[in-house]
């Protein structure tokens, strides 16, 4: 029987779920995108979770599977007619100042490669070699190179997923939605009925659920980044994961994306802060001094969602089985988000999902 499935949230989770639901079924799928502050649309990401030193093994298992899922998703997008993919494996360089920290990181990569071949070749490079590898780089740090690390343009991926969704017969609406009575959604002057609904609205999840009497363990975090157009030959540069919060993502044609900030006290503020942008550019210029004299070509800002224990959650509400939720992905949303969206689509359609999602149950984060 044909069902009505609604997705609220056009970010990475919602757009992926919409793409796969419309690809794998004949149900009527509606995606509602508010279009304001979407973290993944504002983001460009390095996809390389294997060398993260976060200790939580559930988080690592999810993000490692998320990174591996990119290979399948790129195949599916190619099959859908995509000519230029937004994800490329050009490697990732993780910088450390002390030799013992580099060796520790390298060993971590070797250990994890036994169950994650996608890491690829691992190497330790000293500062002298790095300065030769990237001629514009100036550093006294060493780095570990993971050849399997990827880079991603978040906005380009969202556009492709939503284009594929529309080609599959999906309906895309814009606006701020609310849950109504008896399995309905209120969107401006429309009332839409659903059989199943996915709430993939990131930091805005409390706004939707709290009027129904739920308490949601989610807080917003502001993230800003900047772009600089250079004359560097960046096409085959690896992503640079610098000490602190700053990454440098190289794209074709000399474009460098720098960021992102992690601002916990700004709520849903989406104003560009010149001081924060300037500080990030200054930090990046310590490694690429030529950046100091180049103008900023573009800035972006979005709102991430975090839980109190920094783990994401996804699944359906125990007292309302027709309502599915996903939030709390934080700064690893581009890595884990597509895999989460794909899983929820499969479970809703009654297809197999071998991944154990029980550690990410919404029950401990959403109370009534």
For the regions a protein language model found, what residue spans apply to each?
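C-terminal catalytic lobe of FAD-dependent flavoproteins
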Residues: 290, 294-368
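Beta1/beta-strand and adjacent pyrophosphate-binding region of the FAD-binding site
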Residues: 1-11
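Helix-loop-beta segment of a Rossmann-like dinucleotide-binding subdomain
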Residues: 83-94, 111, 118-168, 261-266, ...
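Short beta-strand to alpha-helix junction loop
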Residues: 61-65, 95-102, 144-160, 271-276, ...
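Active-site substrate-recognition segment that forms the wall
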Residues: 6, 16-23, 34, 45-46, ...
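A conserved short coil-to-beta-strand element within the FAD-binding core of flavoproteins
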Residues: 150, 171-185
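Dinucleotide-binding Rossmann-like beta1-alpha1 core, especially the glycine-rich loop
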Residues: 46-133, 283
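Core beta-strand elements of the Rossmann-like FAD/NAD(P) dinucleotide-binding domain
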Residues: 2-3, 188-196
